């Protein structure tokens, strides 16, 4: 079997832990039954020995496969990782979702996306990345009694993303330590109103309002202090036809949204101005993970 799982960008400014979308950048994993266990890693993380010795995908896969099938089989895993690691593009969510879905498939069980999403919550307790990695598109989610509830909206085909990827790994756990311990009532209301309005902008295609709807007072400023150049990236993107520009997930990557022609031009301009950063033009994925 082969499974493709997309990269994701979460929060989108004010939608902390609840909003996310899916990008056409995929981790590809092939799994075959084998006489002996083996693992091969290409792409991102291929030079990381730890990923071979203690691979999260493999650990989750075997845990679920053995629970479902009652068997202890050996498999050959071939990973082609295209999602940058620990850069706020959902690399951990892609691993979790991919491992669970693969385990269900190889156990002979029906792969139901709602079930996969609920199981993924066990390993990542916020749905902003795992939901778009599973469903694709723009997704708004909440958790109620250990169950994920998500509403998906396909993303306008005229839009594209420009993702700026610094050479700075930042785990979600590290990034959360930078968050403020307390929040004022006014700032809480600010984020509630902006996250709600941002969601409405995507649903109703009111893209002209995204620039201010995507503002945040909960997490971005504290997280971006780790890499102050991102404030310059954000300002530059918004001055060059980005509809919105926000920290991607917990960082360190930065996500900008624009109409396709503008996005292509913006990617070139950012790469020229910020030469130390990797820049990618990406279209949006509306399917979530796919088993081939």
Swiss-Prot record:
Keywords: Amino-acid biosynthesis, ATP-binding, Cytoplasm, Kinase, Nucleotide-binding, Threonine biosynthesis, Transferase
Domain of life: Bacteria
Lineage: Bacteria, Pseudomonadati, Campylobacterota, Epsilonproteobacteria, Campylobacterales
Role description: Catalyzes the ATP-dependent phosphorylation of L-homoserine to L-homoserine phosphate.
Coiled-coil regions, chain positions: none
Any single biological process term in GO: threonine biosynthetic process
EC number: 2.7.1.39
Species, as recorded: Campylobacter jejuni subsp. jejuni serotype O:23/36 (strain 81-176)
GO cellular component terms, A-Z: cytoplasm
Reactions listed under catalytic activity: L-homoserine + ATP = O-phospho-L-homoserine + ADP + H(+)
Family named by the database record: Belongs to the GHMP kinase family. Homoserine kinase subfamily.
Subcellular location: Cytoplasm
Residues where ATP binds: 84-94
Gene that this sequence comes from: thrB
Name listed for the protein in its UniProt record: Homoserine kinase
Enzyme class: transferase
